[in-house]
Amino acid sequence: MIDPVRQRFANWQMEELLAKYVDLRLSPAPKGESRITGRIGFSAETPGHRRVVDEYDIQIFLASNYPKAIPLVREVGGRIPKTFHKLEADYLCLGSPTRLRLILVKSPSILNFVEQCVIPYLYSYSIFEHGGSLPFGELSHGPLGLREDFASLLGIDNDDAVLGFVKLLSMGKRQANKLPCACGSHLRLGRCHHRRLNALRNSLGRRWFASLLSSPDARFGRNFPSRRQTTSLTLARFAN
C-alpha cells in the first residue's frame, strides 16, 4: 500500500525542493500539516536591475488542504520589516489570493511555488533594501489593490468594472454569457469578454469568485472593510 504522505510529497515535488535548496528541511508540524524551515539562497536578475545573490531564513507552512489553501511564509531572520508587504502574524504578502491560486492550480509543486512566488518576493526586498525600485511593481492598499490585480488578469483598463466581472465569474457559463458584459460595451458577455472569463472560471471554479463577493476577509468589494492594510507585490517570472 502506498504511503499517503509519501505520495502527497511526491505530488508536491517536496524531495526536489529539498534537493535543490539543501539548507531547507522539513520540521515538526501538527498532523496533516507540513512545515519547511531553513535558509534559502538564490541568484536572480530582471531587466533593468542588477543580479542579486542573497539568502534568507524562512518558514513555509502548508495546511492539510494544500494546494487548495495558499501556503503561508515567514522570513524569520529579522531582516524584512513589518512595513514591507506583510500580512497579519508577520506572513509575507506574496501577491493577490487569486493570482496565487492560479499558480497553484496549474501545478501543486511546492518547488514551483517557491520559485515563482517566494524567491521573487525575497529578490524584490533585496533590491529595495539597497535603494532600488521594486522590479515587479506593487499593488495599492486593500480592496483597490485587489481590483487592480483583477483588472490586469482580465486585460481591462477600468478597475471599477472589476466587481461586475467577478459577479459574472461567480455564475455558470450559460447564465453569464446571456448577460451584459461588465466592460460597458453594451454587448452580451457571450459576444465580448467571454473567452477570458471562461478561462478563469475553468481554472478556479465559480465558487472561488462567489467567495470573493461574500467574504469580508477577501476585501474585494468596494465597500468591504479592510482588516489589513497591506500592499501586494505583483508577480512575474525572472531569470535565475
Where are these regions (language model features)?
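Acidic/negatively charged segments and metal-coordination signatures
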Residues: 1, 98-107, 111-240
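N-terminal membrane-targeting/insertion segments
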Residues: 1-8
